From Swiss-Prot:
UniProt protein name: DALR anticodon-binding domain-containing protein 3
Assembly: Part of a complex containing tRNA(Arg), METTL2A or METTL2B. Interacts with tRNA(Arg)(CCU) and tRNA(Arg)(UCU). Interacts with METTL2A and METTL2B.
SUPFAM superfamilies, alphabetized: Anticodon-binding domain of a subclass of class I aminoacyl-tRNA synthetases
Disease linked to the protein: Developmental and epileptic encephalopathy 86: A form of epileptic encephalopathy, a heterogeneous group of severe early-onset epilepsies characterized by refractory seizures, neurodevelopmental impairment, and poor prognosis. Development is normal prior to seizure onset, after which cognitive and motor delays become apparent. DEE86 inheritance is autosomal recessive.
Keyword Aminoacyl-tRNA synthetase: no
Amino acid sequence: MATRRLGVGETLGALNAALGPGGPVWIKETRTRHLRSRDFLAPHRALQARFDDGQVPEHLLHALACLQGPGVAPVLRCAPTPAGLSLQLQRSAVFERVLSAVAAYATPASPASLGQRVLLHCPALRSSPCALRLSQLRTVLVADHLARALRAHGVCVRLVPAVRDPHMLTFLQQLRVDWPAASERASSHTLRSHALEELTSANDGRTLSPGILGRLCLKELVEEQGRTAGYDPNLDNCLVTEDLLSVLAELQEALWHWPEDSHPGLAGASDTGTGGCLVVHVVSCEEEFQQQKLDLLWQKLVDKAPLRQKHLICGPVKVAGAPGTLMTAPEYYEFRHTQVCKASALKHGGDLAQDPAWTEIFGVLSVATIKFEMLSTAPQSQLFLALADSSISTKGTKSGTFVMYNCARLATLFESYKCSMEQGLYPTFPPVSSLDFSLLHDEGEWLLLFNSILPFPDLLSRTAVLDCTAPGLHIAVRTEMICKFLVQLSMDFSSYYNRVHILGEPRPHLFGQMFVRLQLLRAVREVLHTGLAMLGLPPLSHI
């Protein structure tokens, strides 16, 4: 049996190649009603553009029906229909290939090249938590999620700034944001000397306030970059301060001195330079103008400033019924935490917030609610927060609480099987190679595999894409994809779990189907846990 991981991308690529030269034609089906009869479709209109009268030659139909290749899913049939060319896979064979190698489908499809480095800069973390606005909190969560996605993809990531405020460190721990703490401050002596050289003729001998070195003209540099670069045309001059130079010194230090254990390809190289590194500044739209100044100042004062600097701009955060600026990030966390505690008290009775066993669970649920709210919208778009209690309900299908609830349901299922096995009701789990995957024929089972497990490696890879070659200053990322994926996976699992009884009666003739269903849900659990790890969320065993 072939052992290479099957892939949606590989299958689509082979299907399109089989039709000959031209653009992509095939699409993957996702809706339940379509998946009842087909898995891929070449729409009739697309075929008309490729072939006379939309008729696919017989030899191509034969080639599609016999399609093979690395990572290509085995084909059962391919036939013309009114909608176009419909193709269905050998589902039992696909189930077997995928569920016999579950761990392989919880890793990115295409790891990054060895030695790729990204420096993520989140200026909001230089403030104290009580001054952290909701729009700044969004940048912190986006940067943390992006760092996790890049590292899972094999990219070497360095995070700046190192946090100095102990209260900020505590708050980040509450949010389950993995960010480094500061050990010592980088020296800005060299930068200060360069700045004074540039400023000598600009200050006209005037006395300056403490901490201010003078003004530096940036207009010429903006014009050199050109309008297409994306810099604000109103950028004229920059007030150079000791604090600003300290920020640049830390960035420069981080860029030039990477930890030796940060990536195997960089081992032993303490001064790796700036050439192969991408710097991404993750800032709110309110901070963009100031960050552009810092970017240009870095280029002005340092000969070997990074050539590849990109700005990831996060849109504003609006709170329904109230100005978002009135609520700080810690207040937002406390608000959600209080809601979670109240909801659990109503469900279970008593004041569980005082129970140490529930303290961690409430913290995870609060953070899950916040992260799914903040990260389910594309970071470049404006975000609207609804503070109603429905946002933390396990009944609502869009919330982080709903995802964590289904994570706990999976844990309960496998714990129930384990307990029943220890009691002698069920046998031990047999080798996967002995399972009969033809027993998986419920449409909900194929939906879970085809829409969630099989495409998950490609999703992980797309989450970590940084298009550093695109022209202009700004960069876009798809950090919303993981949250949306986990919500849809939870909805599909919940629908299946509510309808299908997994742990049946302890009768030998029912064990085969039970075990193959458990193996499918093992894969669902693996994918779900991996997705939650990309958000810094641990799986819960109960809620």
